[in-house]
Structure formats: structure tokens, C-alpha cells
Regions:
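Short glycine-rich anion-binding loops that position phosphate/pyrophosphate groups of nucleotides
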Residues: 61-68, 137-139, 195-198, 227
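Glycine-rich adenosine-cofactor-binding loop
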Residues: 8, 98-103, 110, 114, ...
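N-terminal Rossmann-fold cofactor-binding loop
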Residues: 158-162, 225
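Rossmann-like adenosine-cofactor binding region
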Residues: 173-244
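Nucleotide and nucleotide-moiety/phosphate-recognizing core
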Residues: 111, 127-128, 147-154, 162-181, ...
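Phosphate/diphosphate ligand-binding glycine-rich loop within oxidoreductases
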Residues: 2-114
């Protein structure tokens, strides 16, 4: 039996096993199973040894280990190196490689809101967008990397702990860090990468009066949280007439790319998969 894992702490809420086990059944990988495992930091070395011994084929890594896992790996792909964030592990030529599929997953999700022109090689129309990111956690670097690759060059970042925001600025010197509670003078996309909103009624310190569709016809509020489907952040934005998006599409697409790394199969995100998140 080929075993795949998602590791994190906490991990009970993870929907990854539902998605990957569905795909394994759909594509007749009958000798494969995907499980979730709660681990501590001192368990990471053991997980890596399981991969080396072929006891585990592939692993997804979630909070808080996306950076902490890196010292145990032999190699990183380009995006994982750039972001210093890993969410997928796979052994290639006896080397355990850390991949980042979060960035591609986020990139794909933006295509729903900013579809490409007829030339599929063109970047999304983000060059003139002023983008405001809230949070500086494990996935934020992946979001910045995706935005940069699509031509965004006006990125503002704010985090409750300014030191963490400044750490990201070392990776991406072109971003501008602003104090928590303040906002950039111009903005057309606001992205929440914090965990604020996972608990009912949690609110982000943001003045919605400054973000109305009257000012920007394509204003977007994006929350990486997908459960609940509509956070207070998104609900307030929607009620003021702004367009909103949650993290469901990003989550499904990052899973799709991880599955492809492990199996060389690009799975379809069909209605059954989407139901798991509804």
C-alpha cells in the first residue's frame, strides 16, 4: 500500500484526505491511501525518514511546518526556494524535494476573477493594481510570489507583528510594509492571509468605508479562509457592493498540483470534489 500524508498541528480540520482519496479512487490508484497526521516539530525528522525508506510516498505540509521542514530536505523547487515555504514533499532520484504548490494554486484562483486574454501566455492584468495583503504567515510568501509572476508591482503588506512583515520584505524587497490598522492610499485588491475569521464573528481591523465599488469597478476582497465559506471580512465587503472570493479555489488547485507531482496525473476538479468544500 502506498501511503500519502498531510502533516500539521492542528490537523483535524483538514479536508485534504477527502479530496486525495477521491482522486485516488477515481484514477484507479487502488493501492494508495492518503491520511492526516498531527505532528510536533520534533516529529519532522521521523516523517522524512519514512519517505527515505519508502514507507511514505508523498506528504503535504501545512501550518506551522511549511518553513520548519526545509532544513530536513535535500532540495527545493524554484518557488519553494523563493518563498522559503514548502507544502509538498516527494522523493526524486533519492533526493527529498520540497515543492510549493500554494503559489500556483493562488495564481489559478485569480483567473476566475481576472481571466486572461486570448493570448494564454499573457500575464493577468495586475500591473496597474494596488494590492493590499493582510498577514505575514506561512502562505503569504506564496501569494506574493504568485502576484509577482503575474506582473503585480504595487504590493503593500501589513501584519500585527511588524517584524514578521519585515522578514518577508527581505525575501521580496519591492513590497511596502505598512503599520497594522493603516491602509495604502490606493487599493483595488485586499487579500486576507491571516487566520482572523476562522472563528465566528472574528473581525479584521479594517475600515470598509474606504473600499467601495463606487471607486473601483473591479475591486476584489479575497480571503484565503474557505471554512467558513464567508468570513465577516467577506460578508462586510459583499454587503457594501464589493466582489469577494474565498480560498476554496486556491485550496483545490494546490491539491491538484501536489497530486500531479506524486502520480503524474493532473486530476480534474469536478463537482464531487467541489462538494467536499461546500
Amino acid at each position: 500500500m502506498k501511503k500519502y500524508l498531510v502533516i500539521g498541528n492542528p490537523i483535524g480540520h483538514s479536508l485534504s484526505p477527502l479530496i486525495h482519496n477521491y482522486w485516488m479512487k477515481k484514477y484507479k490508484l487502488v493501492d494508495s491511501v492518503y491520511e492526516k497526521r498531527m505532528v510536533e516539530e520534533n516529529d519532522l525528522k521521523k516523517v522524512i525518514e519514512e519517505i527515505r525508506k519508502d514507507e511514505v510516498v508523498g506528504v503535504n505540509v501545512t501550518v506551522p511546518f511549511k518553513k520548519l521542514i526545509i532544513p530536513f530536505l535535500d532540495k527545493l523547487d524554484f518557488v519553494a526556494e523563493e518563498t522559503q515555504s514548502v507544502n509538498t514533499l516527494f522523493k526524486i532520484n533519492n533526493q527529498i524535494v520540497g515543492h510549493n504548490t500554494d503559489s500556483a494554486g493562488f495564481q489559478d484562483s485569480l483567473k476566475e476573477f481576472y481571466p486572461r486574454s486570448n493570448n494564454s501566455m499573457m500575464s493577468l492584468p495586475l500591473e496597474d493594481k494596488h494590492i493590499f495583503i493582510l498577514g505575514a504567515g506561512g502562505v503569504t510568501a506564496s501569494v506574493i510570489s504568485a502576484l509577482k509572476s503575474e506582473g503585480a508591482n504595487n504590493i503593500f503588506l501589513s501584519n500585527r507583528t511588524k517584524e514578521k512583515a519585515n522578514e518577508l520584505k527581505k525575501l521580496f524587497p519591492e513590497i511596502e510594509v505598512i503599520d497594522w490598522g493603516k491602509r495604502p492610499p490606493i487599493c483595488s485588491i485586499v487579500i486576507n492571509t491571516t487566520s482572523i475569521g476562522l472563528t465566528k464573528d472574528e473581525e479584521i481591523n479594517i475600515d470598509f468605508n474606504n473600499y467601495d465599488m463606487n471607486h473601483h469597478k473591479d475591486f476584489l476582497f479575497y480571503d484565503l479562509i474557505y471554512n467558513p465559506k464567508e468570513t465577516v471580512f467577506l460578508k462586510k465587503a459583499r454587503l457594501r457592493g464589493n466582489k469577494t472570493m474565498n480560498g476554496k479555489t486556491m485550496f483545490l488547485n494546490q491539491a491538484k498540483y501536489a497530486f500531479n507531482i506524486w502520480t503524474n496525473i493532473m486530476p480534474e476538479i469536478d463537482d464531487e470534489v467541489i462538494k467536499f468544500l461546500d
